[in-house]
């Protein structure tokens, strides 16, 4: 069926080649990783520390946006390792090393890790702790003296300290300039590239000139938003001075990344044009990009002509209008607090997440899969396949599409890194290596390949798995490997986890990616409704600031999440993909366009002049009506019911009053969201399939 057809092998190969193209700062980052890995490996081998593969791999997950962030990001895994060892010793000593208690502790810890991965704003910490705990508690399943196991557990902390310290040292030696300046530069690079490309279309440049202008845009599209989001997190974590960054910086990064993507799609399909209207539309886009490059802002000068014709160009115009609809900075320095949200103001738990059924359901699924893998490999007396538990904890995601994406990438990385590179090195290279110099040379080459691949947008996770698999096969012990079984056993463990997770996540408790996108969009709309429901008294209360900070972080995170989930729809192999892809596009557009409504309202509530508007009955009434409509839209999206138009008109605000300008802007923002959602399918194939399956089960 056409709806279920997958991309061809040629298409996948083309995407992989695109993902490996050079992008800004990719080479420098890869070389720093190589240097840190080699330095850490030398220290571990010279000091004869038992753990080698895992601590060396952790260098890949260290933040590299600034030396301070590198130090902070190394303290977390090091601290988690200490906590994991402490909990391990408490469980073993407190229960006299009872095997049943050890097993139950694995189930409880993995459940907590899965639940906190959903409920926490610092999600990576929980799975990391779960993985480290399962690693050290499994040592007690072996017939080894207790003092040896305790020393081995402590060696894990020492090994992590050496390798992560090497990574921090390298980052401090090659420190870069301010993250704020680099973030501004990244915005300027993208705006400049977009202006150049669309200016070429506006003046009917030759095909060669257009292609030359298209290439930088295509490479920036391949880079995605991760680099800019990483720089944003540096500013947040270090509480740096925003230095005039625009309001709503995190959402603007997502909007700009989407603008680059749709512009690259247009440039790839149109390398020449003679249409006068298209040239005029491209000139309008180029002008807006130039204004954004100069000041991050552009007048709300919407395109005055029809957007009919080329759909790719229409998407560019829609995204650009969503950017220009964002609020502009004023001369007030108070706007700095609206640019970035310092990490100290981000709540640890997502509001309402602990009471959500989905949080505990996900924790149960992760716990069931990890515990079952743990039982199987110990019952079979086959500890070499312990990678099954690792796969569950690092690949367990909420949606079937995202999970399949990560599992497929993990399997591909294990085959390439563990079998081809790892097994190939053991067979062909290790017999001829007789010094640490030769080993470091081999590790450096493979590390560079893995680091370069890990910087990709679509397949970056494969690079991480290449490194993890290669290190696990070749650096399993302090001596040179002499057997071929480790590579085989790693794949067996991964295959076992794939089978169990496929059954649990895809067959028993499936959550489709489009369903999560609907839930995320509904959460965004309800957050905006909550903002519109704020009264003047509430806006002046002492607790208002903390409430708004949490809501602001939640909405921004959900909009970014929707864009990431949109890319995972491609991996929904088992369902009718085309309707889901269409619905995903609509949900993404609605989320991006809703950002301007949220941020304009947030600016209104942060200023005394704006709060004074909340005392006017006409404005309060319309805000309440729109808040109810946004709540109703959110409910319609969750239930997949048809979206109904608003059709509300007020009579309390005169046509020529300043308040009318605010209301017109508010109505316009809502109308854009509603217009997009009116095209959202009312019911997808996912629910039909589930309903049919439930009816068959009831009949049985």
Name what the model sees in each region.
Residues 72-75, 324:
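Catalytic cores of nucleotide-enabled group-transfer and carboxylate-activating enzymes in metabolic
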Residues 90, 94-100, 104, 429-437:
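Membrane interface segments of multi-pass transport proteins and intramembrane proteases
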Residues 122-125, 172-185, 460, 485, ...:
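Juxtamembrane/interface segments at transmembrane-helix termini
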Residues 406-410:
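Hydrophobic alpha-helical transmembrane segments corresponding to the first two to three helices
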